[in-house]
Amino acid sequence: MRVLVTGATSLLGGAVVERLVARGDDVSVFQRRSGPSGLSEHLGDVADRDAVDRAVHGATAVIHLAARVGVTGPWSEYEAANIVGTQNVVGAAQAFGVRRFVYVSSPSVAHHGASLVGAPAGPADPDRARGNYARSKAQGELIALDADSPDLAAVAIRPHLVWGPGDTQLIGRIVERARAGRLPTVGTGAALIDTTYVENAADALVAALDRAPEIGGRALVVTNGQPRPVREILNRIVLAAGLEPSRVRIPYRIAWGGGLIAERIWERRGSDRDPPMTSFLAEQLGTAHWFDQRETREVLRWSPAVTLADGFDRLAAWFSSIPPTAGDIT
């Protein structure tokens, strides 16, 4: 296949590209800044339709990872990248005869704030999704799946909490907060969460690309299928980075309410940095969110190759390999 990968400089995007190249696909990438891949590279912003058209032209398949991520920031930035950008990539795919389209979504598109215990992949709901990122990704998912047709097989994959060596998003933010003393246990820390090691997520996206003609129009959540208490996950990440876990505990209601206040203060200030706590972060740290993976594994004919234990061993080895001056991966 001639596959275009958008957002290829991200941790997950890079892992996807590696797999496609290794198996012999003709891969090109679309991203905002140049990377070291050595592949056919298109530079630009997904909000620029002309740039998107140039990138998509000639591709027979697209994996769309490019997105504005984060828990804070102006709606206009999320809208431009995650809604307008998706409209542009989907529109170009339709215009240039692309046959397979994988939209990389998030379980947050169907999360309304309550605990998720063995949950299925519920429908994306922009009206109830929590925060600008989730709302914009929900709208993007609807745009992508609405394009599914006999001519273009479109599927949405929702990897949950992707992490691995070199990660500047989930791992980077956790380590940054731990170093600053801003990583408390919210509630008891016993809520179960399920994460996804980056190589497993990449394998699932490639499987979705291969199965797209059979599963077009569907949304699937992808995880390691190994729920663990949130405190255990955080502690293992912090220990892998050579830091001591925090012993500070904050009741859930206090963390949630304080986070809501902090969000409003930071919004009024126009700060581009995350507040010490947000209501969404409190929900992520204080409520369960793990998913039934039976349908995903059956439909994709995929299963995780890297266990949590192996992933944490690799993470610790990576932290040990980087110079002390490079220890701040954010």
Ranges and model annotations:
Residues 211-276, 312-316, 326-329:
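Mid/C-terminal beta-alpha module of Rossmann-like enzyme folds, strongest
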Residues 3-22:
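N-terminal Rossmann NAD(P)H-binding glycine-rich loop of SDR-like oxidoreductase domains
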Residues 84, 114-162, 183:
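Catalytic helix-loop patch of NAD(P)-dependent Rossmann-fold dehydrogenases
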Residues 291-299, 303-330:
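Amphipathic terminal alpha-helices
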Residues 147-200, 207, 237:
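NAD(P)-dependent short-chain dehydrogenase/reductase
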Residues 88-132:
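Conserved Rossmann-fold NAD(P)-dependent oxidoreductase catalytic core, especially the SDR/UDP-sugar
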Residues 138, 151, 163-173, 207-220, ...:
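Glycine/proline-rich active-site loop of Rossmann-fold NAD(P)-dependent oxidoreductases
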Residues 35-36, 43-84, 92, 112:
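NAD(P)H-binding glycine-rich loop region in Rossmannoid oxidoreductase-like domains
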